[in-house]
Design a protein with these regions (language model features):
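Hydrophobic helix-coil surface modules that form long, contiguous segments used
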Residues: 1-133, 162, 174
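Active-site metal-coordination segments of metallo-dependent hydrolases
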Residues: 61-65, 149-157
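Acidic active-site catalytic centers that drive phospho-/nucleotidyl reactions
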Residues: 134-135, 157
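Catalytic Zn2+-binding segment of zinc metalloproteases
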Residues: 136-151, 166, 170-171
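Acidic/His/Gly-enriched intrinsically disordered linker/tail segments
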Residues: 157-177
Length: 177
């Protein structure tokens, strides 16, 4: 959730954030570090940001930012439901065992699935787009609407698996996904 106040103290600072909507505890995430990022706003006003360590130039985050913004806009139009919270932040983590995790409003990724440079192949760009679209699909299937118990996790994953292709095909039709 967006930061609403920072109290600067002598040895430590205190950050206050907007109250989150009700959510499953497994969707909660915090990230702290010396990060840099790029941001944009969707046509409906959602702040979208892509962040990494300073080991990567900011230009390596632009592709992912563009895909994230267009994916959110696609899903809002497709579902007829606005993105449910005020921001969508995407963080490239240098040592992350999972491929990505759809924490609500703070999606975490292995660096290879978010950082794109001038040497990235077309196939790797497609893979990055699919992973971003997959994680953003979970913001509706799995986060906004959460299954009652883990037995039904397959529903979250199957919807996200299908929708990543529907989304990327819609926002990048020349790719013939």
């Amino acid at each position: 959730m967006p930061e609403i106040d920072v109290e600067n103290r002598k040895e430590t600072d205190i950050w206050k954030f907007e109250t989150t909507p009700r959510m499953s505890s497994y969707l909660l995430a915090f990230v702290a570090g010396d990060l840099q990022g790029v941001t944009a706003t969707t046509k409906n006003g959602t702040l979208v940001g892509v962040y990494s360590t300073k080991a990567h130039p900011l230009s390596n985050l632009e592709f992912s930012l563009d895909i994230a913004v267009r994916s959110i806009e696609f899903y809002e139009d497709y579902y007829g439901v606005k993105y449910p919270i005020p921001q969508s932040l995407h963080i490239a983590l240098p040592d992350f065992s999972a491929g990505a995790m759809e924490n609500w409003g703070l999606v975490t990724y292995r660096e290879v699935y978010l950082v794109v440079d001038e040497n990235s192949t077309f196939a790797s760009r497609q893979q990055v787009a699919l992973v971003i679209a997959h994680e953003l699909a979970h913001q509706w299937f799995g986060n906004l609407v959460t299954m009652k118990w883990w037995d039904d996790l397959w529903l979250n994953e199957s919807f996200a698996n299908m929708m990543e292709y529907v989304c990327v095909d819609a926002i990048e039709p020349s790719w013939n996904i």
